[in-house]
């Protein structure tokens, strides 16, 4: 969950998000070292009183400034490719949920159940109870079991949307007429908030996403209750 004046990422709640945080730190350190080196060279060139007007070319310097950037790019590219493959890997999901974007709400359908689905609307500010978050709470949460592979099929009924939950490292575009998929495993119980991340009209800011991760036995109780109400 984000908090005021936060400068970093939200706490990771999935293995993929943990990998993304490590990759961010890795890349940021490389960028910091490059920036420091370039700044040092600039300062040295500006402040030095020594000059050599006879150096017209240097094979050694050209080799260094060709090989060094290539090595740096490889150090960035390899971890990035690994994470890209991890994000696309979907093996034997225990639960599949279809998320449909509408102007301006989400609807969820648990495809492993015969009749389990609902619409998820934002709770208006005047209807919030103490402790709830403005513009982030919904009347129905997407409840999933923790420590289980979850597949989410994402599409849209009208215009482009994007199903995004930062703490899970998930962002998948919802395109009308196209079915995209993503997957995640939530490491711990909790409530995780997201929002539509594709400008989709006047009320784009008012279609939040709330994912609640619970132990498997609690999820079974919840699903049984929802099926009875249906």
From Swiss-Prot:
Spans traversing the lipid bilayer: 15-45, 60-87
Protein name listed in UniProt: Cytochrome c oxidase subunit 2
Obligatory cofactor(s): Cu cation
Phylogenetic placement of the source organism: Eukaryota, Metazoa, Chordata, Craniata, Vertebrata
Keywords: Copper, Electron transport, Magnesium, Membrane, Metal-binding, Mitochondrion, Mitochondrion inner membrane, Respiratory chain, Translocase, Transmembrane, Transmembrane helix, Transport
Catalytic activity of the protein: 4 Fe(II)-[cytochrome c] + O2 + 8 H(+)(in) = 4 Fe(III)-[cytochrome c] + 2 H2O + 4 H(+)(out)
UniProt gene name: MT-CO2
Keyword Repressor: no
Family the entry assigns: Belongs to the cytochrome c oxidase subunit 2 family.
Subunit field text: Component of the cytochrome c oxidase (complex IV, CIV), a multisubunit enzyme composed of 14 subunits. The complex is composed of a catalytic core of 3 subunits MT-CO1, MT-CO2 and MT-CO3, encoded in the mitochondrial DNA, and 11 supernumerary subunits COX4I, COX5A, COX5B, COX6A, COX6B, COX6C, COX7A, COX7B, COX7C, COX8 and NDUFA4, which are encoded in the nuclear genome.
Top-level taxon of the source organism: Eukaryota
